[in-house]
Amino acid sequence: MRPSKRAADELRPVSLERAVSRYAEGSCLVSFGNTRVLCTASLEERAPPWLRGSGKGWVTAEYAMLPRATHERTRREVGSGKPSGRTQEIQRLIGRSLRAVTNLPAMGERQITIDCDVIQADGGTRTAAITGAWVALHDCFAWMRTRSIISVDPLRDHVAAVSCGLYKGTPVLDLDYAEDSAAETDANFVLTGRGGIVEVQGTAEMEPFTQEQLLELLGLARAGTERLVALQKEAIA
C-alpha cells in the first residue's frame, strides 16, 4: 500500500489558482498535494539577441526553491553565484515543455519568462511547475490579446506533466516525497493535450526496469495528464 493510501492510478489533490500576482501578466499557484509552486509570467517587449530580426518570440523559464520549502532550510542558490545543475536542468525542462506547444512567430519579437518558485516541496515539483506554468502562460497571452499586442493565441495545445514510478514493485502515479525517496524507479512524463510526448525522464534507482514496465508507467502518465489537462481547462474556463 502507498504511504498516502492512494490507489496506484490516483493523483494527489490538484488545484490551479489563477491571478495570484497583482503585477505579473499571468500567474498561477499550483498545488499537487503538499507540493505548492508559484508560477508567474513576465512579458518583455524584446526577443533574445539571437532571435532579433527573425520575427519570432521566445518562452523561457527560471526555477527556484524557497529556503524553507523543504523539511530543513536550504541555502539560497544566489549565495553560490550560479544555479545548481539540478536547477538548470529543471528550468530548461520547463522552457522546452512550454515552447513545444507555443507558436513562437505568433508572439512577435518578444520574450516571456516563467518564474517557478517552489513554496513547499513534497515530491513532483518540476511536474507541478510545468502544469501551473502553462496556466500562467495562457493568461499572459490572454492579457496580450486584450491589449491588442497580439492578434491570435500563440498556444497550440495544452501541456502537463506528472511523475510515475515503481514503488515496491508496483507502478504508481504522482509520487510524493515518501514514495519518491523509496521508489525503485522514478520517471517524469511531459505530454500535450493531444497526447504527444514532449519529454520522458526515467531512472532506475535499484534494479533496472523493463520495457513492459516503462509502457505501464507511460499508460499511467497518459491517464494522469489527461486529468491534469481537464483541470487546466476547468481553471481557464
Swiss-Prot record:
Q: Which CDD domains match?
A: RNase_PH_bact
> Which UniProt keywords are given for this protein, alphabetically ordered?
Nucleotidyltransferase, RNA-binding, rRNA processing, Transferase, tRNA processing, tRNA-binding
Residues bound to phosphate: R86, G124, T125, R126
Tell me what reaction this enzyme catalyses.
tRNA(n+1) + phosphate = tRNA(n) + a ribonucleoside 5'-diphosphate
Instruction: Name the enzyme's class.
Output: transferase
Record's keyword annotation contains Mitochondrion: no
Q: What is its EC number?
A: 2.7.7.56
Q: Which InterPro entries match?
A: ExoRNase_PH_dom1, ExoRNase_PH_dom2, ExoRNase_PH_dom2_sf, PNPase/RNase_PH_dom_sf, Ribosomal_Su5_D2-typ_SF, RNase_PH, RNase_PH_bac-type, RNase_PH_CS
Q: What Gene3D superfamilies would the database entry show?
A: GHMP Kinase, N-terminal domain
GO MF annotations, alphabetized:
3'-5'-RNA exonuclease activity; tRNA binding; tRNA nucleotidyltransferase activity
Any Pfam family matching the protein:
RNase_PH_C
Q: Name one GO biological process term.
A: rRNA catabolic process
HAMAP family reported for this sequence: RNase_PH
Q: Name the family the entry cites.
A: Belongs to the RNase PH family.
Oligomeric form and interacting partners: Homohexameric ring arranged as a trimer of dimers.
User: Which PANTHER family does this entry report, sorted A to Z?
Assistant: EXOSOME COMPLEX COMPONENT, EXOSOME COMPLEX COMPONENT RRP41
Function description: Phosphorolytic 3'-5' exoribonuclease that plays an important role in tRNA 3'-end maturation. Removes nucleotide residues following the 3'-CCA terminus of tRNAs; can also add nucleotides to the ends of RNA molecules by using nucleoside diphosphates as substrates, but this may not be physiologically important. Probably plays a role in initiation of 16S rRNA degradation (leading to ribosome degradation) during starvation.
What's the protein name?
Answer: Ribonuclease PH
